[in-house]
Curated annotation (Swiss-Prot):
It comes from Bacillus thuringiensis subsp. israelensis. This is Pesticidal crystal protein Cry4Aa. One of its GO terms (biological process) is sporulation resulting in formation of a cellular spore. Keywords: Plasmid, Sporulation, Toxin, Virulence. Promotes colloidosmotic lysis by binding to the midgut epithelial cells of insects. PANTHER family: ENDOTOXIN_N DOMAIN-CONTAINING PROTEIN-RELATED, PESTICIDAL CRYSTAL PROTEIN N-TERMINAL DOMAIN-CONTAINING PROTEIN. GO terms for molecular function: signaling receptor binding; toxin activity. The keyword Cell membrane does not apply.
Length: 1180
C-alpha cells in the first residue's frame, strides 16, 4: 500500500512548521511508480549510496554540489545570517567565530580552504599566473588563524568570567585583530604581479578570499563598537586602561563597509568582463556562456552574498539584531556539452537560460510534457512552470520551454504552500540516441517542509530505458555547520539546506544529435515566504518581494551588493507582510537610491490599513542616469517619522505610491525595513534628536558670544529648529529643552533685528505692507510656523484683470551705502507669482512656480492645540547647509527675467549705491500674481545685509546708479514740461487762483483738453502695478482735482440737463433715429435722419439774459440746427452745415419773454453730431 494514500498522513505533512506540502491542484501521484518512503535521516550518505548503486540505470551520479569551497561559502553566509539574528552584544562574534574558524581554518589542513578558494576561481577562468603569487596569497591569509583564534578564546574566557583583566584582554585583542586585518588585506591586494592585466587577474583569483577576510575584519569592528558601548553602559569598567572606544571604531567600521563593498563588486565585475571579452579557444574563439554562468554562480555564493550582508555590521543603523534575506537567483546547467555557441550568440544564450529581473517568485508546480510513445526510452519534450509572488494567491504560468507537440502528454508535480524542492536527480538519455529536442527521462525531487522529507518523481513513459543515460544531482550545499556533527555531509538535508528550486528554463539546440540545454534556478533559503515582521529584530524585506507592481514601475538588475534586484519605482507597488504582535510599534524606513535633485525630489507615500498615511521626500543619493554601477554610498536610508502600530490582521498590505510629478527622477528601492521600537531605542532616538538639535542650533551663530547669526541661516531655518525643539521629550530632557528653547528664541530675535524688511513673517498681519484686497494672513498650514501670507489669483472683472499684489518699500534710512543685501524667503506653494526687487530698476524679476509637494509631511488639519508636527514625517530642510536646496532658485545677472521652478526657498541679491534720504530711492520688494488661476503661500521674507561690495560689483552698481540718475533727470524734465502745459490749460479755465468760478467763455472742449493734458502726465503710477502711486502721482492728483472742479462748475452753471450727453439721452425727449455714441472718448449725440428729433423743456429765471452755446458738426447735405423757443413763440436758431469743417462752437444771446423755453435739435438731411449744448445765465 502506498503510504501517501493515507489521508491523515497527507494532512500531517500539510501541517508544516516551516516548509513542505503537495498541492491539491495537481495529481497526487503523477507518476507510475509509487513514491519512495519518507527519509528522515539528516545524513545523506545512505541516500548517495542508494543513488550510486541504482540497479535500473547503473553507474554513478555526477554531482553539481561542490565540496569544500562552495560549502564553505554557504556555511559562512548562513553563519553570518544567523549571527545577525542575535540581539546580545557579543552574539555575532561568539557564534560567528565559533563556526567560521573550523570552516576557514580546518584542523586537518589550515591552508587547504584558502587555497581551494583561489583554485576554484582559477579553474573557471583558466588563465595562467605564476604559482608563487598564489602561494604567497595563501601564506598572507593563513597568518590570520592565530590572531582570530586567540581573540576568540579571550572572548569565551571573558564570557565565562567578565572581570577587569579579562575585559582588558578582550579590548587589547580587538585592537590587535583590527591592526592585523588593516595590514593583511591591503597586503593581499598589493601582492599582485607588476603587469596590470595580470594584477587584475590575480585580484579576481583571490577575491573570494578577500571577501572572507573582509568579513572577519568587519565582524571584529562590529564587535569592537558593541563591546565598548557595553562597557560604557556598565560603569564598573570605568577604571580600564585607555584604548580606542566605540566612538573611535565606528567611523572605521562604516568606512570599511563601504570600501570592502565597492572593491568586491568592482573586482567581481572585472571577472565577468574578462570572461565576456576573452574568446574560448575550445569554442572556435566564441565566448563560453557556461564559464560565464559558473563564475557568476560561484562568485555570488562566495562574494556577493556575503557583501550584501556587510551593511548589517553598521551598528548605528542596526543597533539590535537584523533579519536579512538574499533574493538573487543562481543557475546550474544540464546538457551544455553540445555547444550552443554554434547556433546562438552569447546574449541570446543569456536571455534564454536565465530569467530577466522580476519580482521574487515561489514555485507552485513543474509541468512536463512527455513524448507520445509507448516504446522504451521515452523523454520529456517541453515544460512550463507555475509560480506565485510572495503572499499572493494567484498562480502565474510561464512560457512553454522546448519543442511541444499537441500529442504530448502532461505530467505535473504540484507544490503546496511552504513546500520546497532542495535537491533533485536528473536522468537523461545520452545525446547520441536522441531524435528530438528534449532528453530528460526522469527526475527525482527531494522536498522539504522543514520537519520532514518527501521524495517525488516525474518519469517519462513507462520509465524503461535501454539506452545509455547521464545521471546528475542538482542542488547546493548545507546552510549551517553543526558543531556536534563532527565532519558533516555537505549535501543538503530537509532541515539544513541553503537553496530551493525556483524555476527551470531550457534552450533547444538544433544540432545533429539534438539537445535541450536546461538551467535550474535556485533561490536562497533565507527568503521568508510570509514576509514576517519580527518583534525583537530589525526586519529587512527586499522590495522585489512585492506581489503587485504598477504599470510604470519595473524590476531592474541590482548593482551586485544588494543581495538581489531592485524596483525602479515610478508609480506604485504593494508588499504583503505578516505580523502577530499588535501591541508592538515600529519605525519603517527604506533603503533606496535616487538621482533627483534638490528641486526634483521624489515624494513617496505609504498606505497601511488602520494607519494614518505616511509620506516623505527622498534626498538625492547619486547623479546621472546610469544606475547599473551604483556604489555603496549611492544607497541611503530614509525613515518615515511616524511610529506605526499595525492593525490586528495577520496579513498587512503596504502600498507605496509616488506622489511627485518628476517622472525623470529615478527611485530604486532596495529594501523596506521595520525597526521594533523598544524603550532603549526610543530613548536612544530621543537622545539622538536632542544631540541633533543641539548641533543644529550651535551652527546658527557666527561668533562664540552668540550675538550674530550666520548669514546663510534663514528665518525659515530658525522656525523649523523651533519645531524640532518643541518635539524634544520634556520627560527625558526638561532642562535641555528649556535651554534650547531660549537659544532658538534668541536666534529668532536676532533674525528679526537684522531684517530691514518690516514684518517679514507676518506675525503682525500686514503691518508695513501695501496689499490688494485678495490678500489674507493665515495660520492653518503646518509648513509654516505661525502666520503666513496667502495670495489668491488675480480678479477678472468683465475681462479686466486686477492683479493680486503685496509690496513694501524699504526706506533709505534703513540701508547702508554700497552694500549687498540678501533677499530671500520660503514659498509653500505657488503658481505664476512674480517677485520684483528693485532699487535702480527691476534688478530682480522672477516668476516662481513651486508645487505643493510638502503637504505630505504634515497633517491636513489642526486640532485645538494646533498641528502636531512631532508625529509627522517632516525632516528639517538642510538647516545650516544651504548650498543645495535652499538657494537653488537664484537670480542670473545675465538675464532680465528668471523663471524659478520647484524651489521652495529662494535667495537673490541687490546692491545699493550712494544713499539720498531726500530722494529716498529705497528698495522695493513686491510679489504679484497677474493670472486668475495663480496662487501663492509665502513666509519668512527677509532682506538682510550680506556685506560691502567692491571690485566689479562696485563698478556695476555705480554704473547702474549713474544710469538711473540720468533716467530720473530725463523723467523730471519730461514731467515738468507736461506739468507746465497742463497747469497753464487748467489755469485758463478759471477766473481766479482759488478755482472758484469758470471763465464765462470756458467750454466743455477746453475742460476736456485740460483733462487730456493731465492724463498725459507720465510716471503717475508704479511701473509694475497700475493702481499704485508712482513718482508723479501727487502732482497728477493735484491737477486732476482742479479739472474735476472745472467740470463740476461747468455742470452747475449749465441750465440744460445732461447737456454733454455723458448720461446718454437722459433728460431729453427723443424721436426717430437719434442716439449717443462714444467718439474719441467723448459722448456725442448723433442724428442720422431728418425725421429724428431731440428736445428738452427748460425752466428759466424771468427777465434774465442767457447765452446758448453749441459745439457741433454737420456731415453730408442739409443743415443741422439747434433752436431755442419760448412760450411767446420767440426763437433763436443756430445752424450748422457741412461747409464748416469739424466741430465748431456757435453762440447766441437770448432774452426769453417767458420763464419756460424749449430746446430742439434736428436736421434736414445727412448726419448731425452735437458734442455739447450750454445755456448759461449772463449773471454767472
Amino acid at each position: 500500500m502506498n503510504p501517501y494514500q493515507n489521508k491523515n498522513e497527507y494532512e500531517t505533512l500539510n501541517a508544516s512548521q516551516k516548509k513542505l506540502n503537495i498541492s491539491n491542484n495537481y495529481t497526487r501521484y503523477p507518476i507510475e511508480n509509487s513514491p519512495k518512503q519518507l527519509l528522515q535521516s539528516t545524513n545523506y550518505k545512505d541516500w548517495l549510496n542508494m543513488c550510486q548503486q541504482n540497479q535500473q540505470y547503473g553507474g554513478d551520479f555526477e554531482t553539481f554540489i561542490d565540496s569544500g569551497e562552495l560549502s564553505a561559502y554557504t556555511i559562512v553566509v548562513g553563519t553570518v545570517l544567523t549571527g545577525f539574528g542575535f540581539t546580545t552584544p557579543l552574539g555575532l562574534a561568539l557564534i560567528g567565530f565559533g563556526t567560521l574558524i573550523p570552516v576557514l581554518f580546518p584542523a586537518q589542513d589550515q591552508s587547504n580552504t584558502w587555497s581551494d578558494f583561489i583554485t576554484q576561481t582559477k579553474n573557471i577562468i583558466k588563465k595562467e599566473i605564476a604559482s608563487t603569487y598564489i602561494s604567497n596569497a595563501n601564506k598572507i591569509l593563513n597568518r590570520s588563524f592565530n590572531v582570530i583564534s586567540t581573540y576568540h578564546n579571550h572572548l569565551k574566557t571573558w564570557e565565562n568570567n567578565p572581570n577587569p583583566q579579562n575585559t582588558q584582554d578582550v579590548r587589547t585583542q580587538i585592537q590587535l585583530v583590527h591592526y592585523h586585518f588593516q595590514n593583511v588585506i591591503p597586503e593581499l591586494v598589493n601582492s599582485c604581479p607588476p603587469n596590470p592585466s595580470d594584477c587584475d587577474y590575480y585580484n579576481i583569483l583571490v577575491l573570494s578570499s578577500y571577501a572572507q577576510a573582509a568579513n572577519l575584519h568587519l565582524t571584529v569592528l562590529n564587535q569592537a563598537v558593541k563591546f565598548e558601548a557595553y562597557l560604557k553602559n556598565n560603569r564598573q569598567f570605568d577604571y580600564l586602561e585607555p584604548l580606542p572606544t566605540a566612538i573611535d571604531y565606528y567611523p572605521v567600521l562604516t568606512k570599511a563597509i563601504e570600501d570592502y563593498t565597492n572593491y568586491c563588486v568592482t573586482t567581481y565585475k572585472k571577472g565577468l568582463n574578462l570572461i565576456k571579452t576573452t574568446p574560448d579557444s575550445n569554442l572556435d574563439g566564441n565566448i563560453n556562456w557556461n564559464t560565464y554562468n559558473t563564475y557568476r554562480t560561484k562568485m555570488t555564493t562566495a562574494v556577493l552574498d556575503l557583501v550584501a550582508l556587510f551593511p548589517n555590521y553598521d551598528v548605528g543603523k542596526y543597533p539590535i539584531g537584523v533579519q536579512s534575506e538574499l533574493t538573487r537567483e543562481i543557475y546550474q546547467v544540464l546538457n551544455f556539452e553540445e555547444s550552443p555557441y554554434k547556433y546562438y550568440d552569447f546574449q541570446y544564450q543569456e536571455d534564454s537560460l536565465t530569467r530577466r529581473p522580476h519580482l521574487f517568485t515561489w514555485l507552485d508546480s513543474l509541468n512536463f510534457y512527455e513524448k507520445a510513445q509507448t516504446t522504451p526510452n521515452n523523454f520529456f519534450t517541453s515544460h512550463y512552470n507555475m509560480f506565485h509572488y510572495t503572499l499572493d494567491n494567484i498562480s502565474q504560468k510561464s512560457s512553454v520551454f522546448g519543442n511541444h507537440n499537441v500529442t504530448d502528454k502532461l505530467k505535473s508535480l504540484g507544490l503546496a504552500t511552504n513546500i520546497y524542492i532542495f535537491l533533485l536527480n536528473v536522468i537523461s538519455l545520452d545525446n547520441k540516441y536522441l531524435n528530438d529536442y528534449n532528453n530528460i527521462s526522469k527526475m527525482d525531487f527531494f522536498i522539504t517542509n522543514g520537519t520532514r522529507l518527501l521524495e517525488k518523481e516525474l518519469t517519462a513513459g513507462s520509465g524503461q530505458i535501454t539506452y545509455d543515460v547521464n545521471k546528475n544531482i542538482f542542488g547546493l550545499p548545507i546552510l549551517k555547520r553543526r558543531e556536534n556533527q563532527g565532519n558533516p555531509t555537505l549535501f543538503p538535508t530537509y532541515d539544513n539546506y541553503s537553496h530551493i528550486l525556483s524555476f527551470i528554463k531550457s534552450l533547444s539546440i538544433p544540432a545533429t544529435y539534438k539537445t535541450q540545454v536546461y538551467t535550474f534556478a535556485w533561490t536562497h533559503s533565507s527568503v521568508d515566504p510570509k514576509n514576517t515582521i519580527y518583534t525583537h529584530l530589525t526586519t529587512q524585506i527586499p522590495a522585489v518581494k512585492a506581489n503587485s507592481l504598477g504599470t510604470a514601475s519595473k524590476v531592474v538588475q541590482g548593482p551586485g551588493h544588494t543581495g538581489g534586484d531592485l524596483i525602479d519605482f515610478k508609480d506604485h507597488f504593494k508588499i504583503t507582510c505578516q505580523h502577530s504582535n499588535f501591541q508592538q510599534s515600529y519605525f519603517i524606513r527604506i533603503r533606496y537610491a535616487s538621482n533627483g535633485s534638490a528641486n526634483t525630489r521624489a515624494v513617496i507615500n505609504l498606505s497601511i490599513p488602520g494607519v494614518a498615511e505616511l509620506g516623505m521626500a527622498l534626498n538625492p543619493t547619486f547623479s546621472g542616469t546610469d544606475y547599473t554601477n551604483l556604489k555603496y554610498k549611492d544607497f541611503q536610508y530614509l525613515e518615515f517619522s511616524n511610529e506605526v502600530k499595525f492593525a490586528p490582521n495577520q496579513n498587512i498590505s503596504l502600498v507605496f505610491n509616488r506622489s511627485d510629478v518628476y517622472t525623470n527622477t529615478t527611485v530604486l528601492i532596495d529594501k523596506i525595513e521595520f525597526l521594533p521600537i523598544t524603550r532603549s531605542i526610543r530613548e536612544d532616538r530621543e537622545k539622538q534628536k536632542l544631540e541633533t538639535v543641539q548641533q543644529i542650533i550651535n551652527t546658527f551663530y557666527a561668533n562664540p558670544i552668540k550675538n550674530t547669526l550666520q548669514s546663510e541661516l534663514t528665518d525659515y531655518d530658525i522656525d523649523q529648529a523651533a519645531n524640532l525643539v518643541e518635539c524634544i521629550s520634556e520627560e527625558l530632557y526638561p532642562k535641555e529643552k528649556m535651554l534650547l528653547l531660549d537659544e532658538v528664541k534668541n536666534a529668532k530675535q536676532l533674525s528679526q533685528s537684522r531684517n530691514v524688511l518690516q514684518n517679514g513673517d507676518f506675525e503682525s498681519a500686514t503691518l508695513g505692507w501695501t496689499t490688494s484686497d485678495n490678500i489674507t494672513i493665515q495660520e492653518d498650514d503646518p509648513i509654516f510656523k505661525g502666520h503666513y501670507l496667502h495670495m489668491s489669483g488675480a480678479r477678472d472683472i468683465d475681462g479686466t484683470i486686477f492683479p493680486t499684489y503685496i509690496f513694501q518699500k524699504i526706506d533709505e534710512s534703513k540701508l547702508k551705502p554700497y552694500t549687498r543685501y540678501l533677499v530671500r524667503g520660503f514659498v509653500g506653494s505657488s503658481k505664476d507669482v512674480e517677485l520684483v526687487v528693485s532699487r535702480y530698476g527691476e534688478e530682480i524679476d522672477a516668476i516662481m512656480n513651486v508645487p505643493a509637494d510638502l503637504n505630505y509631511l504634515y497633517p491636513s488639519t489642526f486640532d485645538c492645540e494646533g498641528s502636531n508636527r512631532c508625529e509627522t514625517s517632516a525632516v528639517p530642510a538642510n538647516i545650516g547647509n544651504t548650498s543645495d536646496m535652499l538657494y537653488s532658485c537664484q537670480y542670473d545677472t545675465g538675464k532680465k527675467h528668471v523663471v524659478c521652478q520647484d524651489s521652495h526657498q529662494f535667495s537673490f541679491t541687490i546692491d545699493t549705491g550712494a544713499l539720498d534720504t531726500n530722494e529716498n530711492i529705497g528698495v522695493w520688494v513686491m510679489f504679484k500674481i497677474s493670472s486668475p488661476d495663480g496662487y501663492a503661500s509665502l513666509d519668512n521674507l527677509e532682506v538682510i545685509e550680506e556685506g560691502p561690495i567692491d571690485g566689479e560689483a562696485l563698478s556695476r552698481v555705480k554704473h547702474m546708479e549713474k544710469k538711473w540718475n540720468d533716467q530720473m533727470e530725463a523723467k523730471r524734465s519730461e514731467t515738468q514740461q507736461a506739468y507746465d502745459v497742463a497747469k497753464q490749460a487748467i489755469d485758463a479755465l478759471f477766473t481766479n487762483v482759488q478755482d472758484e468760478a469758470l471763465q464765462f467763455d470756458t467750454t466743455l472742449a477746453q475742460i476736456q483738453y485740460a483733462e487730456y493734458l493731465v492724463q498725459s502726465i507720465p510716471y503717475v503710477y508704479n511701473d509694475w502695478l497700475s493702481d499704485v502711486p508712482g513718482m508723479n502721482y501727487d502732482i497728477y492728483v493735484e491737477l486732476d482735482a482742479r479739472v474735476a472742479q472745472a467740470r463740476y462748475l461747468y455742470d452747475t452753471r449749465n441750465i440744460i440737463k445732461n447737456g454733454d450727453f455723458t448720461q446718454g439721452v437722459m433728460g431729453w425727449h427723443v424721436t426717430g433715429n437719434a442716439d449717443v455714441q462714444q467718439i474719441d472718448g467723448v459722448s456725442v449725440l448723433v442724428l442720422s435722419n431728418w425725421s429724428a428729433g431731440v428736445s428738452q423743456n427748460v425752466h428759466l429765471q424771468h427777465n434774465h439774459g442767457y447765452v446758448l452755446r453749441v459745439i457741433a458738426k454737420k456731415e453730408g447735405p442739409g443743415n443741422g440746427y439747434v433752436t431755442l423757443m419760448d412760450c411767446e413763440e420767440n426763437q433763436e436758431k443756430l445752424t450748422f452745415t457741412s461747409c464748416e469743417e469739424g466741430y465748431i462752437t456757435k453762440t447766441v444771446d437770448v432774452f426769453p419773454d417767458t420763464d419756460r423755453v424749449r430746446i430742439e435739435i434736428g436736421e434736414t438731411e445727412g448726419s448731425f453730431y452735437i458734442e455739447s449744448i450750454e445755456l448759461i445765465c449772463m449773471n454767472e
